[in-house]
């Protein structure tokens, strides 16, 4: 534990276009090599494309996608007497949002569409409809936690 205590939480910057801190977080997850304007162009293009394709408010689509991808349980490794157990633990709210954004961006990078804007747009639409690789990742995480429920008493 550091002597100075935990690092202070930074104030959440609200997105100038949509007025949502979730959009800012998504831009920061898409960001590569410090090229923020490129990341903003990708995210705004994806949100506009989602708006045109679904006809819904893009921030609502993003929130629905996040709700469908956010994990409630995950497994953590815990070493007990020479054996390593996968112990299911509940996920904090901030971490679940971060994981959901990370999974959405990661799986959109692996998609087959031509541009990152299209990939992110389609992954967001799929996730908001309960489909896609990022939703499957959440289901796999929950399944892993469910199958290791016997080790829940090792929780810390």
Curated annotation (Swiss-Prot):
Keyword Cytoplasm: no
UniProt record, GO biological process: translation
SUPFAM superfamilies from the UniProt entry: Ribosomal protein S7
Domain of life where this protein originates: Bacteria
Record's GO cellular component terms: small ribosomal subunit
Gene Ontology MF term list: rRNA binding; structural constituent of ribosome; tRNA binding
HAMAP family assigned to the protein according to its UniProt record, in alphabetical order: Ribosomal_uS7_B
Database matches in PANTHER family: RIBOSOMAL PROTEIN S7 (PTHR11205)
Family to which the UniProt record says this protein belongs: Belongs to the universal ribosomal protein uS7 family.
Protein name according to UniProt: Small ribosomal subunit protein uS7
Organism of this sequence: Parafrankia sp. (strain EAN1pec)
């Amino acid at each position: 534990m550091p002597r100075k205590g935990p690092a202070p939480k930074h104030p959440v910057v609200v997105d100038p276009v949509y007025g949502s801190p979730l959009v800012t977080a998504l831009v920061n997850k898409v960001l590569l090599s410090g090229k923020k304007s490129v990341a903003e162009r990708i995210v705004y293009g994806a949100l506009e494309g989602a708006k045109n394709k679904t006809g819904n408010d893009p921030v609502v689509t993003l929130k629905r996608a996040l709700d469908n991808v956010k994990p409630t349980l995950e497994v953590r490794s815990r070493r007990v007497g020479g054996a390593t157990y996968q112990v299911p633990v509940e996920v904090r709210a901030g971490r679940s949002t971060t994981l959901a954004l990370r999974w959405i961006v990661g799986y959109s990078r692996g998609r087959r569409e031509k541009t990152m804007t299209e990939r992110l747009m389609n992954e967001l639409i799929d996730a908001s409809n309960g489909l896609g690789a990022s939703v499957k990742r959440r289901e796999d995480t929950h399944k892993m936690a469910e199958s290791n429920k016997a080790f829940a008493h090792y929780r810390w």
